[in-house]
Amino acid sequence: MSLWNRILDTINIGGASSSSDNDISSFTRDADSYAFVDVEVGVKNHKIQDIGALRHDEATFHRNSKADLLDFLSDIDFVCGHNIVHHDAKFLFGDKRQRWALVDTLYMSPLLFPERPYHRLVKDDKLMSDEINNPVNDCEKARELLFDEIAHWRSLSERRQHIYASLLIGIEEFDGFMQMVGAESNANDSLVELIQAEFYGKICANADIKTLAVKYPCALAYALALIDTTDQRSVTPAWVLYNYPEVEYVIRQLRHTRCAVGCEYCDRQLDARYNLKRFFGYDSFRTYDGEPLQENAACAAIDGKSLLAIFPTGGGKSLTFQLPALIEGGSVHGLTVVISPLQSLMKDQVDNLADRGITDAVTINGLLDPISRSLAIERVQSGDASLLYISPEMLRSKTIEKILMARHVVRFVIDEAHCFSAWGQDFRVDYLYIGKFIKEYQERKGVDTHTSVVFHGDGKAESGSRYM
């Protein structure tokens, strides 16, 4: 009996062991065996301070000796751990080839638990532990997480398993897990056909899946996991976006790039009028002297264009960026950042959306008390918000910078842009920082974020939109 089958014999579909948590001997009596390893490393000197290990037979190891650890692992086939590939194994073995298959619970967690609430044992990229600086305890938690991951893998459809295996077998962060569960790619059906069938109606039918799979296999796997969530507030962890920034590009290609020939997904989910009715209850956009300025601006934003829009006062300009923001909040779990000059205007827009039952908007400004500010920041970080209103001065805040780096920002909107269209005594120099911030953001994340600039115009001759 394989290790995989023995594990499944003791784990039910929800991830709970059918025997006691510490009794795992029933599936470890054959030649296949495994151990969990955790290494504590000094923050300053980057040297190993402590080593802990937990073997399949419940034997434990806890001392700072690599030689003794190797003896402890002498009959092991799989060495498991949380971030073991790029942390523990590097400090223990360096770049030397090991005979063990490394099973990393870190990289599988967002793939198998992409939806809120996320796995209880994982926060960001860290494993939640009961004790500080106790590597044996960390091994126990990693074992619990791995068992849950295996149980969830078993619950996936055979087609989904083939998709993930086809994308990830041979990639060191995932290969050990794939070996442990005996995953196999499907040789009978093409990967493109499998993905199109598994995610029918959730992605563009004409997306170039083949190219994405060849160039970005890991990013495609994470993107597909997120796409399958039912809670749009679920977001890709910041550490995944840091290591695989292509996730944002891939999910946009699958979910928010309108195909030329049209398909069921694009014709409905990316249609401006359908979503206007869905979110705001309107049957049509406003027109000005017969010209559909509002619809033109909204459609340009939905299609991923940077644009300049000039509207008469009271012309409904806010809807031209709110509607695309709500659409992208659902399609790519994205965040739109609205830079507005007045805190009262920010509050009015958030309140007006809330009156319509739309709770996706939040503002962070200096008028908030510490508790309200903390709650607002948490809503942005957690994915509750798809619209964030801030002043230009807030872009200099390290807190704002941190939370924006952790989210998939799809667009920056400069609202009430007439505030910096001319010099004057009350000119706010922080408006000059907006361009620098956006450029640095794009460079650090390796993405192209779109921009909308919205002006008030006093006369109809000034009203219109331009694409940039």
Language model features: what each stretch is:
Residues 310-315, 320-360, 442-449:
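Conserved SF1/SF2 helicase motif Ia
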Residues 45, 52-128, 135-153:
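Conserved DEDDh/DEDDy metal-dependent 3′-5′ exonuclease domain
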Residues 262-310:
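Conserved pre-motif I regulatory segment
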Residues 95, 345-370, 379-382, 468:
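Conserved helix-turn-beta segment of the N-terminal RecA-like "Helicase ATP-binding" lobe
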Residues 405-406, 410-411, 418-468:
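Post-DEXD/H (motif II) to motif III coupling segment of the RecA-like Helicase ATP-binding lobe
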Residues 1-32, 104:
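N-terminal accessory regions of nucleic-acid-interacting proteins
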Residues 121-206:
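Acidic, Mg2+-coordinating catalytic module of metal-dependent nucleases/exonucleases
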Residues 326, 368-411, 419-425:
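Conserved helix/coil segment N-terminal to the catalytic DExD/H
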